[in-house]
Amino acid sequence: MSEITYPSQSRELVCFSTIQVQTVQDGIVNLFFAYDVFSKFIMSTPGCINLTPANIMKQVDFLMHHKDFTIKDIPFTLVMDIGQDLEEELNLIVEPFKGKVIFDTDFIEKEMMPDIAVMMKLVGKGS
C-alpha cells in the first residue's frame, strides 16, 4: 500500500473504482463509484458494459464534471485500482481540476469497498 495521507476535509482524498453487477437487460455491467474518504459520501457515474481504456477515461472525466464532485475547488488525490496503464492520460484529465491520480488496490479494498458492499446490500433489499 502506498503512503496516503488521510484527509482533513471532504474531497481531498477520493477513491474511484468499479464493481460488476448482473442485469437482466445487459448482462454484466460495470458500475463506477467515487467515495470521499473524509465524509464517506458515495457518488456514482454512468456504468458501462465493457471496461475499456476509453470507458475508464470517460468515467473519470464524467466524475470531474459531476455536480457533487465540483462543489469544492481544492487539490485532491484520486485513488484508483483500475487503469494503471492509463496513469498519464488519467492525470491529464484530473490535473485541470487540481487533482492527481494514484493507484492503490489495498486502500480501495480497505476504505471504500466495505461501504459500497453495505450500500449494494441495501439497494438489493429495496431500502
PLM feature spans:
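RNase H-like DDE/DDD metal-dependent nuclease/strand-transfer catalytic core used by mobile genetic elements
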Residues: 4-15, 19-28, 37, 41-127
